[in-house]
Curated annotation (Swiss-Prot):
NCBIfam families: CM_A, DAHP_synth_Bsub, PRK08673.1, PRK12595.1
Domain Chorismate mutase, residue spans: 1-90
EC id: 2.5.1.54, 5.4.99.5
Name recorded for this polypeptide: Protein AroA(G)
Keyword annotations: Amino-acid biosynthesis, Aromatic amino acid biosynthesis, Isomerase, Multifunctional enzyme, Phosphoprotein, Transferase
Organism per entry: Bacillus subtilis (strain 168)
Pathway involvement of the protein, from the record: Metabolic intermediate biosynthesis; chorismate biosynthesis; chorismate from D-erythrose 4-phosphate and phosphoenolpyruvate: step 1/7; Metabolic intermediate biosynthesis; prephenate biosynthesis; prephenate from chorismate: step 1/1
Pfam family of the protein (one): CM_2
Post-translational modification Phosphoserine, affected residues: S2
GO biological process, one term: chorismate biosynthetic process
Gene Ontology MF: a single term: chorismate mutase activity
Source lineage: Bacteria, Bacillati, Bacillota, Bacilli, Bacillales
Length: 358
């Protein structure tokens, strides 16, 4: 074969490359439109039956010289790239996505700027039991410079016979204590009907793990001008967690804090399994601040310090933990709450590694 003939073949290969490129991009645009249609219908983007049908059709029409296995490998990569295009389009469309808003969202809680680069703490009892109990914890928190107090007034429990909380009376106690100690308060709301009433008493609406996909509650929380702390569901994927936050933001409320609180696995050594890798993933995928609840993720008082260190080291915007004047007589979760001296020691060990906004 002469050099001229070789050059002609190379030119032909170059032309075919450009034709293939054009067809691949044309296919990509079609796939993106299919993705939009599937999203509108609520259908999964990946359809293994459809993919197998397409591969079978391609192989049946393969006249060589490539082996069927080679052709199948090439087209599976094309299909994979198309699926990634659909997922990229979906993530770009989300209001919570960092692709939509590159800069960090800062959540203002009575002057505390969550997400500004300074790491903070939220502490308080698992459940509001009395004014005296909450006031004692508030005094200890205030002494340590903590400005956000947590406390459960409505308690969704696994058993219907466990303590369910004081309800509105608990919110009133939180409000009274917060006013006396100049603190912000956060408390869980479990039904949309309670949100309007709760606004008079709390500074942050908490949506707990069991309600992460209570979509009516998410929409109701998104419709009010009050910060929301959203906890990850017991067995929720990160994608499901992000989409739950999207429900809130889609209603107009962008003051959202995400909270990793452990997920359910087969491990029984801890109450849940802390997914520490979720923190940087959520920080990369969204523009929202991320907290870690070390109490519910472990269920063990002896693990609160190392898990809090891990949370701060990996870049969480803050740590949430439970404190009780006398955990041994607590009406809920006594094994995982810190007594006040334990809390003070815990915080003193963490303070040297806390990142402060310059």
């Amino acid at each position: 074969m002469s050099n001229t003939e070789l050059e002609l073949l190379r030119q032909k290969a170059d032309e075919l490359n450009l034709q293939i490129l054009k067809l691949i991009n044309e296919r990509g645009n079609v796939v993106k439109e299919i993705g939009k249609a599937k999203e509108a219908q609520g259908v999964n983007r990946f359809d293994p039956v459809r993919e197998r049908t397409m591969l079978n059709n391609i192989i049946e029409n393969n006249d060589g010289p490539f082996e069927n296995s080679t052709i199948q490998h090439i087209f599976k990569e094309i299909f994979k790239a198309g699926l990634e295009l659909q997922e990229e389009d979906h993530s770009k469309a989300l209001l919570v996505s960092r692709k939509k808003k590159p800069e960090d969202t800062i959540v203002d809680i009575k002057g505390e700027k969550i997400g500004d680069g300074q790491q903070r703490f939220i502490v308080g009892p698992c459940a509001v039991e009395s004014y005296e109990q909450v006031a004692e914890v508030a005094a200890a928190a205030k002494k340590q410079g903590i400005k956000i107090l947590r406390g459960g007034a409505f308690k969704p429990r696994t058993s219907p016979y466990d303590f369910q909380g004081l309800g509105v009376e608990g919110l009133q106690i939180l409000k009274r204590v917060a006013d006396e100690f100049d603190l912000a308060v956060i408390s869980e709301i479990v039904t949309p009907a309670h949100i309007e009433e709760a606004l008079d008493y709390i500074d942050v609406i908490q949506i707990g793990a069991r309600n992460m996909q209570n979509f009516e509650l998410l929409k109701a929380a998104g419709a009010v001008k009050k910060p929301v702390l959203l906890k990850r569901g017991l067995a929720a994927t990160i994608s499901e967690f992000i989409n739950a936050a999207e429900y809130i933001m889609s209603q107009g409320n962008d003051q959202i804090i995400l909270c990793e609180r452990g997920i359910r696995t087969y491990e029984t050594a801890t109450r849940n399994t802390l997914d520490i890798s979720a923190v940087p993933i959520l920080k990369q995928e969204t523009h929202l601040p991320v907290f870690v609840d070390v109490t519910h993720s472990t269920g063990r008082r002896d693990l609160l310090l190392p898990t809090a260190k891990a949370a701060l080291a990996i870049g969480a915007d803050g740590v949430m933990a439970e404190v009780h004047p006398d955990p041994s007589v607590a009406l809920s979760d006594s094994a995982q709450q810190m007594a006040i001296p334990e809390f003070e020691k815990w915080l003193n060990e963490l303070k040297p590694m806390v990142k402060v906004n310059a």
